[in-house]
Amino acid sequence: ELIKILESEKAYDGIMALHELKLLQYIIPELERGVGVEQSRHHVFSVFKHSVESLKHTPNKKWQIKFASLLHDIAKPQTKRMKDCYPSAGSGQVATFYNHDLIGAKVAAKIMSRLKFSKADTDKVVLLIKNHMFYYNVGEVTASSVRRLIRKVGEENLADLIDLRVADRLGSGVPKAKPYKLRHLEYMMEKVRFDAVSVKMLKINGDDLMKLLKIEPGPKIGAILDVLLSEVIEDQELNNREYLEKRSFELNKMDLKQLREQAKEKIEEKKMEDDEEIKKEYYVK
């Protein structure tokens, strides 16, 4: 029945009805503990209100993502601590919720086990909650750091994780759903995912060349691959085994220094062109 509520267009209304009828406390009592729990200064809503508002604004229609939105701050009540503000932030105290993401993932796992959800669904929701606080700074990000994030959460979960961040943001009463940094992350994901301009896209590799040309590992292998790649960039139809093998024999007999320099220029030019196209798609600079 809970899945039916989450799958519906009125999931928010359904959860609020359970809350108002005093039934939610018997299904997910951990969620009720957020009622009246205030957050830090930039949050408009209590923990409970923020949770249901996040559910309401989840852009993804899959019930697992909606459930992750509802439970993503489930551990905030138990992790709340008050500490003095830094002098630059004014006077008084501010609420902190250290490790609420990690603890919340464990709490969510217990909830879903208690409610007899499948292991696959539980793993999905838990992973999203555990990683919903991932750090991303446009000025510091690199392709390798994005690759690490992809390896950590799985490429198949990245779009869902971004949807959870959007739900979290809108559920805080912030009008702009997808800030620049999230659009920039999508751009970097696209860039890393395709990584199109690389010798890896060729239908031949270094091992193939060594066997074919009977040569030892060395810079000549890389030079031949670079030249082949530059030619394939110009004409994708050349990326076939027959042509690449024939052309490799020809290149093996040539002085490749100048050819490789020209190839590198062509490769960099193509990378920049592709990068600009992806940036336009996600409205980033």
Q: What annotation goes with each model-predicted range?
A:
Residues 13, 49, 103, 141-144, ...:
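Charged, alpha-helix-enriched surfaces in structured cytosolic catalytic cores
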Residues 1-70, 74-99, 103-117, 193, ...:
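Glycine- and charge-enriched loop/helix tracts that form the active or gating conduit
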Residues 19, 113, 151, 210-211:
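Short polybasic/polar patches that bind polyanions
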Residues 14-18, 54, 104, 129, ...:
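A residue-level signal for conserved active-site and pocket-lining positions in enzyme catalytic cores
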Residues 33, 37-46, 52-56, 117-177, ...:
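Histidine/acidic-rich helix-loop-helix segments that form or flank divalent-metal centers
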Residues 84-88, 102-103, 120-132, 146, ...:
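Active/binding-pocket-proximal capping segment
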Residues 23-24, 133, 215:
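Core structural elements
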Residues 139, 148, 173-285:
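Terminal helices and disordered tails flanking the catalytic cores of nucleotide-processing hydrolases
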